[in-house]
Amino acid sequence: ENQLALIGVKPEDIKTVVLSHMHLDHAGNIHLFKHANVYVPKADFMFGQTQVHLNPDPATHGGYVKADLDVPVKQYILVDEDFELAPGIEVVNLPGHTPGLIGLIVHLEKDGTIILPQDCVYTQEVYGPPAKASGLLYDSIEFFKSIEKLRKLQKKYNAKIVFAHDYEFFKTLKTVPEYYE
């Protein structure tokens, strides 16, 4: 809420949310957007539901939190294929870290194309080349296929990739009040 407030936006102003996957560090605070349409990867949503509802021990849930998965939102839209979300915004499937994971490709007039792969690839070091398996991986084969897909998309669009967990890389990004156009 505090970050949105810095740009004059309230959670209720947001009508569409895209969750890359349902791990706690991405789905946390989804309760602030109960009024929104929430896009989530179908395979990950179903896997997370299974994890939290079939085993009562949270220590075995692997990054999924029951409270996040049970939030009643306006509508969950389960994604299982690539598509255009809005003009200039594409949703792409990048599984591996989790059974399903989605990223965004954002085409900007001034700053060009930016790819937000989220936990498909944590850092520049993991991206390589060569790509390196790291962190939590549900399916290592799908992980490496997703990295190759990212490389093709990066080349196709001459895109900049924003790594979701690369703290050194974060220092190079614009922050509020600056923004990308």
Regions found by a protein language model. Give the residues of each.
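Hydrophobic/aromatic beta-strand patches that form the interior of the parallel beta-sheet core
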Residues: 18, 39, 77-79, 92, ...
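Active-site metal-binding motif and surrounding structural segment of the metallo-beta-lactamase
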Residues: 1-40
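Active-site metal-binding loops of divalent metal-dependent hydrolases
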Residues: 22, 43-44, 97-98, 118-120, ...
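Cap/insert and terminal regions of metallo-dependent hydrolase folds
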Residues: 103-181
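A short secondary-structure junction signal
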Residues: 29, 49-52, 102-105
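Metallo-beta-lactamase
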Residues: 3-9, 13, 42-93, 141-158
